[in-house]
Amino acid sequence: REVAKTELNLEMAATAEMQEIALALRPDSVCVVPERREEITTEGGLNLSDAPASLGDMVATLKDAGIHVTAFLSPDLKHIQEAARFRSAAVEIHTGAYANANRLRVEHELKRVKDAAGAIRHLGMRVHAGHGLHYHNVQPVAAIAEIVELNIGHAIVARAVIDGLAAAVREMKSLMTAARHGLAT
């Protein structure tokens, strides 16, 4: 925690062990994600309909410690309504289906993200998005007004190997800013 001079976000599974780590680290926020041992990366959002009551207790404990809690969810309205019930501060929309969509489905998946963003904002939560976003697909998502945070890691790090971290971040930021101002390329 001493190293991070900006906002620190911890992505974590909804386990007692991770809760202890979060309480010890005191990040500014946590994003609760599903964790399946067989996955290399998160392949979907939390299923809050089947979430145990202990998840609500975990959210309350983290909030009491001053940690903002975000739920990582697929763009499914049923799960978004559940996030409001758990009193999440924010929802991160899982954009994997959009990122992996072929040309025939990409507009449909983008509409799902837009509709989810509107519903999340309407319920009073902050809207974040991420998963599979890269330099060629980020602008339509960045243009969604309700989204206040994008989480992009792999694409930036991969580009940084070739161009350097500063240039990779600068290029991604430029794409996102252009999309916000209606100047998407």
Predicted regions and their residues:
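C-terminal helical cap(s) of enzyme catalytic domains, especially alpha/beta-barrels
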Residues: 44, 105-106, 159-182
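Short beta-strand/loop segments at the ligand-binding rim of alpha/beta enzyme cores
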Residues: 1-10, 58-71, 120-130
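Hydrophobic faces of well-ordered beta-strands that scaffold small-molecule active sites
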Residues: 8-12, 30-32, 69-71, 91-93, ...
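Histidine/lysine/aspartate-rich catalytic loop segments that bind and position anionic ligands
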Residues: 68-123
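Glycine/small-residue-rich loop that forms an oxyanion/phosphate-binding "nest" at active or ligand-binding sites
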Residues: 1-51
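Glycine-rich phosphate-binding active-site loops on the catalytic face of alpha/beta enzymes
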Residues: 32-39, 89-102, 145-165
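Catalytic cores of alpha/beta
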Residues: 16-25, 76-86, 129, 133-147
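Glycine-enriched alpha-helix->loop->beta-strand junction motifs that scaffold or abut catalytic
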Residues: 3-6, 25-30, 64, 85-91, ...
